[in-house]
C-alpha cells in the first residue's frame, strides 16, 4: 500500500525556481565581492570560485598568471580533460557548457589511487595526480 504524504503548508515565501536562485546568487556575489584587481575574464573565474566556496573575501587570496584564462580556454576548446579530486565538483560541472564535450574525471575512488596512497603514505588526492 502506498501512503499518501500531505504537502506541508507554506508559512513564508521563498524562491523555488532553481534558475532564479542561481541568478540571484551570482548577483549577490558580483555585488558583494571586490573584483577590481582582475581583468573581466579573470573576474568571471573568481565569481564562480566565490559562488562555489561561499567566501566573499576569497579575491584577496587569488592571483592569476597573465596567460591562465586564455590557456585554459584553449585547452578546453582543444578537448583537454578536466581532473578534480572531489566527486561533488565533478557533479557540479555543467557538461553542456563545455566547449568540446570534455571528459570530467575524478580518480579519488579509483582503486589504483587508493593503493598508491597507502603505499606512498599520502592522500588519495595526491596519489591520483600520478595516474
Where are these regions (language model features)?
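Long, charge-dense
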Residues: 97-131
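A generic local secondary-structure boundary/capping motif
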Residues: 71-73, 95, 131
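Amphipathic alpha-helical interface surfaces
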Residues: 68, 89, 125-128
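Electropositive, gly/pro-rich neighborhoods at or near active sites that engage anionic ligands
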Residues: 2-83
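Internal active-site segments that recognize and position negatively charged phosphoryl groups
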Residues: 78-100
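Short glycine-rich, polar/acidic loop-and-turn segments at beta strand-coil junctions
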Residues: 53, 86-88, 108
Amino acid at each position: 500500500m502506498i501512503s499518501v504524504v500531505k504537502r506541508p503548508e507554506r508559512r513564508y515565501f521563498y524562491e523555488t525556481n532553481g534558475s532564479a536562485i542561481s541568478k540571484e546568487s551570482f548577483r549577490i556575489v558580483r555585488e558583494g565581492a571586490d573584483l577590481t584587481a582582475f581583468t573581466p575574464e579573470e573576474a568571471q573565474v573568481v565569481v564562480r570560485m566565490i559562488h562555489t566556496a561561499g567566501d566573499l573575501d576569497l579575491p584577496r587570496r587569488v592571483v592569476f598568471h597573465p596567460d591562465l584564462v586564455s590557456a585554459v580556454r584553449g585547452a578546453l576548446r582543444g578537448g583537454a580533460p578536466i581532473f578534480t579530486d572531489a566527486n561533488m565538483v565533478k557533479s557540479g560541472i555543467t557538461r553542456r557548457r563545455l566547449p568540446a564535450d570534455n571528459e570530467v574525471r575524478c580518480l579519488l575512488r579509483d582503486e589504483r589511487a587508493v593503493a598508491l596512497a597507502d603505499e606512498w603514505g599520502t592522500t588519495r588526492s595526491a596519489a591520483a595526480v600520478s595516474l
